Structures are given as structure tokens and as C-alpha cells.
Regions:
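Hydrophobic alpha-helical transmembrane segments of multi-pass integral membrane proteins
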Residues: 1-433
Length: 433
């Protein structure tokens, strides 16, 4: 996932500078969303659904296979987009589809019975359904490049693209994000639910999934009324979640952490995205330039909301997994570090500043270009800060693995063989920063 993050940032720069040919923007979007975001979601669900639900993972072999199928398929898919090799595009898309569907099957078999679902598990189950629909439409779009079958079936290709993007971003990704935030925001602020919170959660649990389905169907069928109703429901559901998380952050009972700092950015970006996008979707929910947000505001959602949720969550997930495997058995027998001691606070602070500055600079640059035909200096500066922040974040996570994991990086990736650290490997001691 970290490799795809860096590749996505690089492709974003190449898109802005015009360095590559082919479908560069499409490759950029798929590397970040299908690569960095979705592979992170796959790993997080595989690791934490068994913990949250107090069950055993259905199959670790499937978990390893799905990673390589999605990662390998996506690498070939991106190469096909850049070289305009449409035959390879369909083949690579098929490999990705198998990987995603293995993931859906594995997690669905891991989840408890439907009657025992809590709100997080219910959102995860819905997200799995959206994964099936989004990837299925995605493969049809890849095949359509060489067959033109969508036209023969009476569908507008751009309408199918809009439905696919809606199911992928608002269905698969955002439904997962919402479900995780309900669990994580409560857990890591050590706060209780207000009397209004269950009402907001029930409102969102009905309105948001129905809105995603209506927006996707409205775009597929080119029905503006259905799409408009669905879009407004999506905005209302996301704003409800943002309100709950913002209140928990204000009432937090714990010291501020990199995770909470990034979640704070998320709540602000949700408000800004909702205000701009509601108006755009009221006017025209089928417009190509307002597919995920108002014109010029797509990064509010993609980076400001989804990206910062993933970044903040990884600041807990990666150290937590390493801590469990390396130190949990030593607890009570010898001094062990806290989870937040495993990463560098200094790097975390600097990467946060770079990424936030890059986001704000990029947004101002995009808005200047869209609405005022302004210069691209802000956009270039923002992009440079994002690249630096992504590199620092990746370095911080890799240092956690290098210094503290009982396994080598090769072993963590699931390559067969003995990849335990030997006695000559660096000791995973506590950082002294």
C-alpha cells in the first residue's frame, strides 16, 4: 500500500506536468484508490475484523493470495493504461477482480451472523457488497475498450463510469471509512456516546447506503431526479458522521496523537466538501466535473477525508500490529514500549505539516485554476509538499517495521520461507526520541 501511495503521488506530479502519455489521470486515480486506499482497507479488515468481532479469520492463505492478485493486477492495469494496451487492460482487470472478490469472500465468511452485527460490522458488510458491484462494473468498462458491448447493451459509457466511481468511492471506500470511524473515534478518544449520537448513527445507517445506491443507479440510468435525491442523502450521511467525530475529538479524554490530529483535519474537510458538493449536486448530479465533489473540490474528499483517515489510522494500525507480534508476550516480564513509542513523533509532526500544507496549497491552486484561471504556482508548491509528506510518512512506517518487527519486510509480505530476525539483526529497542 505504501508503494502505491508513492507511485500515486508520482503519477499525480506527472499528470500535472504532462510527463507521461496514455491515460495518466486514470492511472493516477486507480493507483491511489485501488492501490493505496483499497489495499489498506483489505489489510485493515483482515487484521481487525477478527478482533472487533471476536472471531477467527476464515483463511490466511486467501488473505495472502488476495494481496498479490490485487497488487499484481493493478500494476499491470496501470501499465496498460499508460501504454494504451487494451487487451492487457481487460486481463489485468480480471486478475484484480479475482483478488477483490477473494477478499470479499474471506471477510464475509469471517464476519459473525447478520443478527449479531453491530454498527461497524453492518457497514463493513455493506461495503463488501459495494466492492462486488464496483469491481464488476470496472471489469465491464475495461472489456468495453475492445468490444464496445456497453453501447450494444444500450448504456452510455460515461454513465457507467459515473456509476462505477460512485460505487467505488462512496460505496466501497467511504462505507468502510464510516464504519471504522464509529469504532476508532470512540475507542481512541475514550468518550461515550451522547444521547443524540445513536439517533444520528441510525439516520446515517439508513440514509447513506440508500443514497449511494440511488446516486449510482441515477447516474447509470441518467436519471437526474434519482441521482439528485441520492446525492443529497450521501452528503447528509457524511455530514452526520463528521459531526459525531468532531464532537468526540472536542471531548477527548486522552493526549493528542498523530491519529487524532489527522482525524481533526477530516472533520473540517467533511464540512467543506458537504457545503460545496450539496450545491453542485442540486444543480446537476450527472455532470462529469462534479462526479465526486463540486468542481475543483475533489481533493477535499479524496485526500482531505479518505486520505487523512487512512493516514491517521495507519499511525495506530502499523505500530499496533508490530507491538502485538513483538512485545505482547513480554508484557509483565520485562520493560516494553508503548504503541505510540514505536514511531518517531518528530517525523509524524513534520509529515503532518507537509501533507496539510500540501493539501491546502493544492486546493487553493485548483480553485484558482477552475474559477479564476489563476497561476499554477500554488498547485506546484502543494504537490511538492505532498510528495515530501508522503515520503516522510512512508519512512516513519518502514522504520517501525525495521526497528521493531520480529519479521523481515520479505516475511511480512507473505513470501514463503523463514524470515524471522536472527540474533544479529538490530534490536527492536524503544526509540529514544
Amino acid at each position: 500500500a505504501l508503494v502505491f501511495l508513492l507511485a500515486g503521488v508520482g503519477l499525480g506530479l506527472a499528470t500535472a506536468m504532462g510527463w507521461l502519455s496514455g491515460f495518466v489521470r486514470l492511472a493516477h486515480l486507480h493507483v491511489l484508490l485501488a492501490g493505496w486506499i483499497c489495499i489498506t482497507i483489505m489489510g485493515a479488515m483482515t487484521q481487525f475484523v477478527p478482533v472487533w468481532s471476536a472471531v477467527s479469520l476464515h483463511s490466511r492463505r486467501l488473505a495472502t493470495a488476495q494481496l498479490w492478485l490485487v497488487a499484481g493486477g493493478l500494476a499491470a492495469f496501470v501499465a496498460a493504461l499508460l501504454t494504451l494496451n487494451f487487451a492487457l487492460l481487460a486481463a489485468a482487470g480480471s486478475v484484480m477482480l479475482v483478488g477483490f472478490w477473494l477478499f470479499v469472500y474471506n471477510i464475509f465468511r469471517t464476519l459473525p451472523p447478520l443478527t449479531e452485527f453491530d454498527i461497524t460490522e453492518a457497514h463493513f458488510a455493506l461495503a463488501l457488497g459495494f466492492f462486488l458491484l464496483a469491481t464488476g462494473l470496472g471489469l465491464l468498462l475495461a472489456i468495453d475498450f475492445t468490444t464496445g458491448m456497453l453501447f450494444e447493451w444500450g448504456f452510455n459509457r460515461l454513465a457507467v463510469v459515473g456509476s462505477h466511481a460512485t460505487l467505488a468511492v462512496f460505496g466501497a471506500v467511504m462505507t468502510t471509512v464510516v464504519g471504522a470511524l464509529y469504532q476508532l473515534a470512540t475507542m481512541f478518544t475514550q468518550t461515550d456516546l451522547h444521547r443524540s449520537d445513536p439517533l444520528l448513527q441510525r439516520f446515517e445507517s439508513v440514509v447513506y447506503p440508500a443514497g449511494v445506491a440511488a446516486l449510482a443507479a441515477g447516474r447509470l440510468l441518467e436519471n437526474p431526479v434519482l441521482a439528485r435525491l441520492g446525492g443529497l442523502a450521501v452528503v447528509a450521511g457524511v455530514l452526520a458522521v463528521g459531526f459525531i467525530v468532531a464532537r468526540k475529538l472536542l471531548e477527548t479524554q486522552v493526549d493528542w496523537t498523530p491519529m487524532l490530529s489527522r482525524y481533526a483535519v477530516v472533520t473540517v474537510m467533511i464540512g467543506a466538501w458537504g457545503a460545496l458538493t450539496a450545491r453542485a449536486w442540486l444543480v446537476d448530479p450527472l455532470a462529469a466535473d462534479s462526479l465526486l465533489a463540486a468542481p475543483g473540490a475533489v481533493h477535499l474528499l479524496a485526500f482531505g477525508v479518505v486520505g487523512f483517515v487512512v493516514l491517521g489510522t495507519l499511525y495506530h494500525i502499523v505500530p499496533f500490529i508490530i507491538w502485538v507480534h513483538r512485545y505482547s508476550d513480554l508484557l509483565g516480564y520485562e520493560p516494553v514500549p508503548m504503541i505510540d513509542d514505536l514511531y518517531s513523533d518528530r517525523l509524524a509532526a513534520v509529515d503532518f505539516g507537509c501533507l496539510l500544507g500540501g493539501l491546502l496549497g493544492g486546493l487553493l491552486g485548483v480553485f484558482a485554476g477552475v474559477y479564476f484561471d489563476g497561476p499554477t504556482l500554488l498547485l506546484a508548491a502543494g504537490g511538492a509538499l505532498v510528495i515530501l509528506g508522503a515520503l516522510l510518512f512512508t519512512a516513519n512506517m518502514l522504520l517501525v517495521v525495521r526497528r521493531h518487527s520480529p519479521h523481515t519486510l520479505v516475511g511480512i509480505l507473505g513470501v514463503p520461507g523463514d524470515h524471522e530476525r536472527g540474533e544479529d539483526d538490530p534490536s527492536p529497542a524503544v526509540d529514544q526520541e
